[in-house]
Structure formats: structure tokens, C-alpha cells
């Protein structure tokens, strides 16, 4: 029993295929979705999207957006999305270190907010990689 998942960014279609289950990071916590889920629209936080295919899970880093669930279709509109398999681990770790350093030297409210967002994005990318490695091991 499957349903269609479509993940879109402003520039591309990241995913458009049948899945068995997903777990989303919403602004109010995580939500699991199976076939015949009740209709819902929700805001998405910067976080991990877990996608269950037949017998394996895939992980994707989402950079915030919205999801619409209904009629066995889920449409996810996000600022950006990356499959964990497409993320370079060394580059992601380096980006995380830079984001942490930028937060430490941020001055003023605006710089602090921007640095916090960059740090959350960087942590999400690293988390996606770590979760994928754990599933493989």
C-alpha cells in the first residue's frame, strides 16, 4: 500500500514517486504519514524527511516550507532539499564548523538570527548523513 510523494523546490522536482511511509519535521513536531492519512496542511521546519520505500528508508534534508496531505498524495514545497546521498560529508562538516564560528562572532540581533538559521541548516545536513550511515551499518 503506497501513496505519491512529491517534493518541490523553486528550481526543481526533488522527488516524485510512490512511497510506503514518511516522517516529516513540522513546526509543531514530527508527523508520520501512511496511506489514507487524514487531510492536513502544515508548515515544515528545517529538518529531516524520512522516506520509506518497500524495505528501506531514505533520508532527505528539508530547509523549511509547507506540506499538503490528502487523497493519498503528499505535496511538499520547500526552500531547498537535498537527498542525504547527494551531500558531501566533508563539505557538510566544514559548513557546520563555519556556521558555529559565525554564530560565536555574530553581533546584533539580525546577525545572530541569520547565524542561527545557517547553523540549523548545517546541522540538518549533517544529521541526514549520520542517519543514512546508521541505516547502512
UniProtKB/Swiss-Prot annotation:
InterPro entries, alphabetized = ATP_synth_F1_dsu/esu, ATP_synth_F1_dsu/esu_N, ATP_synth_F1_esu_C, ATPsynth_dsu/esu_N
Location (main, coarse): plastid
Q: Which UniProt keywords apply?
A: ATP synthesis, CF(1), Chloroplast, Hydrogen ion transport, Ion transport, Membrane, Plastid, Thylakoid, Transport
Q: One short Pfam family name for this protein? A: ATP-synt_DE_N
| Membrane-topology descriptor | Peripheral membrane protein
Write out the similarity annotation: Belongs to the ATPase epsilon chain family.
Please explain the role this protein plays, according to its UniProt record: Produces ATP from ADP in the presence of a proton gradient across the membrane.
Name of this protein: ATP synthase epsilon chain, chloroplastic
Q: What is the species of this protein?
A: Pisum sativum
Gene name for this UniProt entry: atpE
